[in-house]
């Protein structure tokens, strides 16, 4: 789904053309009938992750080199960054949407080296093992 975004802003996250990590994901899915349990306001990333677990909407193996190299992750899948002591579900503090793959070249054996393209356009590296949902 196309969501026009201009600026990152947590206070203005639900206004048109503004977003933070969870409202970007929610706005994209909301237009297609998925609202992560909240019809009118984007939940925080941890609550989105909890919804994915409760509704059995997880990708086996999560964010892993095997899932990337074997192209098991789909555009629209969402990665939840965990590990903070923030009192939220599984310590989730960030969510990113996958939009596709990046091709880095070939290794010495001729196998493609792939990475993930994120909806924010940033080429970030996230630690492997993060939870991935497929709403």
Where would I find each of the regions flagged by the language model?
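N-terminal capping segments
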Residues: 1-38, 84-85, 90-91
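Aromatic- and glycine-rich peptidoglycan recognition patches
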Residues: 34, 39-42, 46, 54-70, ...
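Residues that form generic nucleotide/phosphate-binding pockets
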Residues: 51
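Structural motif
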Residues: 76-77
């Amino acid at each position: 789904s196309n969501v026009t975004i201009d600026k990152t802003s947590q206070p203005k996250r639900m206004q048109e053309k503004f977003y933070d990590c969870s409202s970007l994901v929610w706005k994209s899915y909301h237009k297609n009938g998925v609202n992560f349990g909240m019809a009118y306001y984007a939940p925080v990333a941890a609550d989105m992750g909890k919804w994915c677990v409760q509704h059995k909407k997880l990708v086996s193996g999560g964010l892993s080199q095997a899932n990337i190299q074997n192209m098991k992750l789909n555009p629209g899948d969402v990665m939840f960054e965990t590990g903070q002591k923030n009192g939220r579900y599984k310590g989730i503090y960030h969510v990113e949407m996958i939009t596709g793959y990046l091709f880095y070249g070939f290794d010495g054996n001729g196998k493609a080296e792939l990475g993930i393209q994120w909806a924010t356009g940033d080429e970030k590296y996230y630690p492997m093992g993060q939870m991935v949902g497929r709403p």
